[in-house]
Every structure is written in structure tokens, then in C-alpha cells.
């Protein structure tokens, strides 16, 4: 029998035993102490978080986690501002960028699953300053999402129980989510798994309804197909509307990259991460493109309900059901949005708290945020990040509501910053890999279309970060202009500050001196026969990187 090491070589167990080295995976040999061996330890040795997420958790977290209130409610605002064509273009183009980013994540995180994801890798392969900019931009993105979802959740419950004030619902659920997150990552993964299935089923049900509705099979209504693309039209505000929709779409795609963070707490990142990455195109087509097509087909962009004050009523799903003649459908949609809100808050707390934990381990945040209890739960980081969500209470006051809306809208440019850093870091890792004489064949996962995917993503994210506030130029809107661009100068100042006061230089790391084996590990539950067969199967990277794009498409569903 043979066992697998990091270089995918085989060694004889008997020979290994003579050398007094414990094999990782062998059914007839005593198991290694999982707390002593860093490769298969139950806890990440660099951050202390527990490795409890299963393959199915990671897979459904990536697939169902992107179906949030933004897609169900916020996309209606995007439809109103841009029209169905703008929505389709926005989801398609941002989807191409998201696909490129996920290919980069697949290569980076499968190679280096330990230690904290892309912020840690940005420090190792660039400097101390880059992860600060990327990490805090990521915190801002999910802080904005968290505050918005607390407010959305409370608004939904007020739809049914208006006698309870908005702040009452916010405080009740603040404590509930705090307690839930402190239980542990295993419960988080299991809960998100089942919530993801509910969201997928709900979205597919809406697609089926849409097909029946536009085909004229509801209450003998005539078929109208894509009539709303002609009247009132495909675009509501021309190119300006398209520019606005791009910012919306970038926010809706945020969280796609969270697989990189979850890998640190995954039992088997070598299997889970590639599986999640291969599902990216599936997510883009079924979730985002599907939403763009069916929203544009069932709801005209000038429907007055898209600007309704009640979040439930301005959901395109609720509007379509109401237009079909089912007035009580708003309650069903309300329940569906409630499920997505619970999942979105849960996911935002997880992503934001782990990002703070990793920043603290890099010396870029207070050390207390790096502390985890004996169960691997980063209690201080969870509590601090959850406390940031209380800014949603500002929306209770009429005077503070405008300030609240500006804060929530910060998330758009933050996504472009994070994605740009991920793509740049991928280029640096590959450059270091080649500079030290490593073979591309050694990579456990090779990004499709490299180097075009990271280069395209980097260029596109820089471009979109610079033009995403274009709609506020004429007529000039000072408040929204500052809101659109404030993170860019703040990020530059943060970068300079870290270089001056922490690093004492502006140099980047020497790629030839980096330890390329640091941060690599084996899967905890890898089975020898599975590992050997996977190396010979069509899912391995030897076949994957030599396959055509159509071969790649066929592997997405396996």
C-alpha cells in the first residue's frame, strides 16, 4: 500500500515505518495524533480556528450563499435604474470578472488553504500594506451588508407585526445571531447548507412560475414573452443606467470569494475548494443570469412598485406574482426573503469576523481579535463585527437615515478593491512559483486560461473602481460622489501609512526568497484509494488544464 505526500509521490508504508515516520492515510496503521500533526490537526495552527466545515458545506455555501436579499429586493432597484438590458449586461460582465477571480482563488487556496485566505497570501507575496487595504475593504463590504440585512430583516417582520418597533426587531436578532455564531463553525456550516437548499428551491420555483406566466398559462392571460423589453423598453436611463447597475451587480456578487476564507476551516480544502470553484459558472448562469432574464421578462422597469417603501412589495418576485393576479403572494415572498436575510446575516458575520481575525494575526488589527477559545471560535472578532451591525439602528431616525444609506452604499467599490487584490496576488504567486524553479505540473489546481483570467480581472476591477461613480458627475452630486470614491483615497493613505509606520519601507517581498511550502496541508479525511484514483481521473488538473473549455463545462456538473 502507498500513501500520498504533498508532492503527490508514493512511499511504501513499511519503509516509512522503519524511518519512524507516521503515515497520514493508512487503514492498517495507527492514526496520527490530529492535534500534533499540523496537516491533519482539528485546528488551523496559524489562526486557531477549528476545521469543521465539510465538503458539502463549502459547496452549498458557495452556491446558495450568493442568493441573498440583494438578488431578491435590490435587483428590483437595479432593474428600475437601468432596465432589463442593463441588468443582463451587468450580471454578465461582472459574472465574467467573478469567474476570473474564482479561478485565481481555486489555484491559490487549493495550494495554500491554511492561515487566512487571500489577505494572508497578499502579505506573503507582496507586503504588509496590501492585506491591510484588501482586508479592511472586505470588512467594509460585509459591514455594509450586515447593517443593511439587519434593517431588511426587521422591515420584513414589521410587514407582519408592525406593533413591534424596528429597533426592537434589530436588537432581538442581534443577540440571537451573536449566540448562534458563538456555538461554532460546524453549526454555521450545517445551517447554511440547509438554508442554501431552501433558497435554491425557492428560486427555481420562481423560474418555473415565470415561464408559465409569460407563456400565458395563468388565468387564460395571453402570452406576452419578452414584451417588456419593447414597452417600456430595454434601457431606462441609457449608458448612465448601465453604469449604475454595474455597482449594484458587484455588490450582489460579493461573497462569491468567501470560499477562500472558509477553506481555512475546511476539513478537506483539497477537494472542497476545486468543487466550489467548478460550480462558479453554474452559479452565474442559474442564479444571476436567470434572475436578470426572468425579472426583465415579468416586470417592466417603470412599475411603480419597484420604488415602493416596503421592501417586500418592491421585490420583482412579489410584483410579478401580484401582476399575475395572486394578491396574497406577498406573504410567500416575504417568507422567502426572510430566509435569505437570515442566511445573509449569518454569512456576513462569519466572513467579517474571520477577516478581522486574520488581520489581527497579520498584526494589522488589535491582537485581541486574533484570540479563539478552545473550540476554535474567535469570540472577540465575532462580537466586535456584530456590534458594527448596530449601525442599522441609525435608520430608525429620520435624521440619521441619510447617513445610514451612505454608509451602506460603500460596499460597491470595496468589492472591486478586494477582487483586484486577489487577481494581483495570484499573478505574484505564479511568478514566485516559476522564479523558484517549480513546475506548473506540481500545482494541485491550475487556473483556467492563465494568465488571461487574472490580468483581465485586475484591469477590469481597476477600471470599474474608477468609473463606478460616473453617474454622479453630471449633474454633480457631492454626497453620492464622495460615497462612491471615498474608499480609494482612504485605501491609498492606509497603504502609505502601513509602509511608513509598520514596514519602514515601500519594497515588496523578494519572490525568490519566499517559502513556497508554508501554508500547504493535506486533507483531514482523505482516503488513500480516493486520492490515488482522483489523480488518475478526469477531474485531476492534468486533464483539467489540457481540456477544452467545453470539457471544462461538462465537469462543472460532476
From Swiss-Prot:
Entry annotated with the keyword Transmembrane helix: yes
Localisation: Membrane
Keyword Transmembrane helix: yes
Principal cellular location given in the protein's record: membrane
Cellular-component GO terms for this entry: endoplasmic reticulum; membrane
UniProt topological domain (Cytoplasmic) ranges: 1-57, 103-126, 190-193, 263-280, 346-375, 424-446, 502-558
Keywords: Amino-acid transport, Membrane, Transmembrane, Transmembrane helix, Transport
Pfam families noted in UniProt: AA_permease
Family: Belongs to the amino acid-polyamine-organocation (APC) superfamily. YAT (TC 2.A.3.10) family.
Purpose: General amino acid permease with broad substrate specificity.
Protein known as: General amino acid permease AGP3
The gene coding this protein: AGP3
Amino acid at each position: 500500500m502507498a500513501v500520498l505526500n504533498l508532492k503527490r509521490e508514493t512511499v511504501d508504508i513499511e519503509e516509512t515505518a522503519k524511518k519512524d515516520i507516521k503515515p497520514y492515510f493508512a487503514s492498517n496503521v495507527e492514526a496520527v495524533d490530529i492535534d500534533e500533526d499540523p496537516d491533519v490537526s482539528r485546528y488551523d495552527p496559524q489562526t486557531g480556528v477549528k476545521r469543521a466545515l465539510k465538503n458539502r458545506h463549502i459547496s452549498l455555501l458557495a452556491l446558495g450563499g450568493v442568493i441573498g436579499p440583494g438578488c431578491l429586493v435590490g435587483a428590483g432597484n437595479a432593474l428600475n435604474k437601468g432596465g432589463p438590458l442593463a441588468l443582463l449586461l451587468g450580471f454578465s460582465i461582472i459574472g465574467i470578472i467573478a469567474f476570473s477571480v474564482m479561478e485565481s482563488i481555486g489555484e491559490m487556496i487549493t495550494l495554500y488553504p491554511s492561515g487566512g485566505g487571500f489577505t494572508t497570501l497578499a502579505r506573503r507575496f507582496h507586503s504588509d500594506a496590501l492585506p491591510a487595504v484588501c482586508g479592511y475593504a472586505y470588512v467594509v463590504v460585509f459591514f455594509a451588508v450586515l447593517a443593511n440585512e439587519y434593517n431588511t430583516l426587521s422591515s420584513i417582520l414589521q410587514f407582519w407585526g408592525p406593533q413591534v418597533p424596528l429597533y426592537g426587531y434589530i436588537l432581538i436578532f442581534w443577540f440571537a445571531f451573536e449566540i448562534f455564531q458563538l456555538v461554532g463553525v460546524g453549526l454555521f456550516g450545517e445551517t447554511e447548507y440547509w438554508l442554501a437548499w431552501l433558497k435554491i428551491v425557492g428560486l427555481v420555483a420562481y423560474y418555473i412560475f415565470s415561464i408559465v406566466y409569460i407563456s400565458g398559462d395563468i388565468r387564460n392571460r395571453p402570452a406576452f414573452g419578452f414584451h417588456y423589453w419593447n414597452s417600456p423598453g430595454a434601457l431606462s436611463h441609457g449608458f448612465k443606467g448601465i453604469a449604475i447597475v454595474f455597482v449594484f451587480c458587484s455588490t450582489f456578487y460579493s461573497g462569491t470569494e468567501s470560499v477562500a476564507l472558509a477553506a481555512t476551516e475546511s476539513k478537506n480544502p483539497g477537494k472542497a475548494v476545486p468543487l466550489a470553484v467548478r460550480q462558479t459558472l453554474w452559479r452565474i448562469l442559474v442564479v444571476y443570469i436567470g434572475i436578470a432574464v426572468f425579472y426583465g421578462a415579468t416586470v417592466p422597469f417603470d412599475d411603480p412598485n419597484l420604488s415602493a417603501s416596503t421592501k417586500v412589495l418592491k421585490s420583482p418576485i412579489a410584483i410579478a406574482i401580484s401582476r399575475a393576479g395572486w394578491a396574497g403572494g406577498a406573504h410567500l415572498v416575504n417568507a422567502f426573503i426572510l430566509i435569505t436575510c437570515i442566511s445573509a446575516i449569518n454569512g456576513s458575520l462569519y466572513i467579517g469576523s474571520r477577516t478581522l481575525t486574520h488581520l489581527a494575526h497579520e498584526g494589522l488589527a488589535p491582537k485581541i481579535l486574533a484570540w479563539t477559545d478552545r473550540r476554535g471560535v474567535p469570540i472577540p472578532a465575532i462580537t466586535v463585527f456584530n456590534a458594527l451591525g448596530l449601525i442599522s439602528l441609525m435608520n430608525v431616525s429620520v435624521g440619521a437615515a441619510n447617513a445610514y444609506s451612505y454608509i451602506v452604499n460603500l460596499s460597491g467599490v470595496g468589492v472591486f478593491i478586494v477582487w483586484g487584490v486577489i487577481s494581483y496576488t495570484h499573478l505574484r504567486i505564479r511568478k514566485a512559483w516559476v522564479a523558484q524553479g517549480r513546475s506548473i505540473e506540481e500545482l494541485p489546481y491550475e487556473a483556467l486560461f492563465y494568465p488571461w483570467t487574472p490580468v483581465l480581472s485586475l484591469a477590469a476591477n481597476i477600471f470599474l473602481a474608477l468609473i463606478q461613480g460616473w453617474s454622479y458627475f453630471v449633474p454633480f452630486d457631492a454626497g453620492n460622489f464622495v460615497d462612491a470614491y471615498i474608499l480609494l483615497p482612504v485605501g491609498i493613505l492606509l497603504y502609505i501609512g502601513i509602509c511608513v509606520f509598520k514596514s519602514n519601507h515601500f519594497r515588496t517581498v523578494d519572490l525568490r526568497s519566499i517559502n513556497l511550502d508554508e501554508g500547504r496541508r493535506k486533507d483531514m479525511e482523505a482516503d488513500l484509494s480516493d486520492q490515488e484514483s482522483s489523480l488518475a481521473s478526469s477531474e485531476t488538473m492534468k486533464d483539467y488544464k489540457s481540456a477544452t473549455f467545453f470539457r471544462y463545462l461538462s465537469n462543472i456538473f460532476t
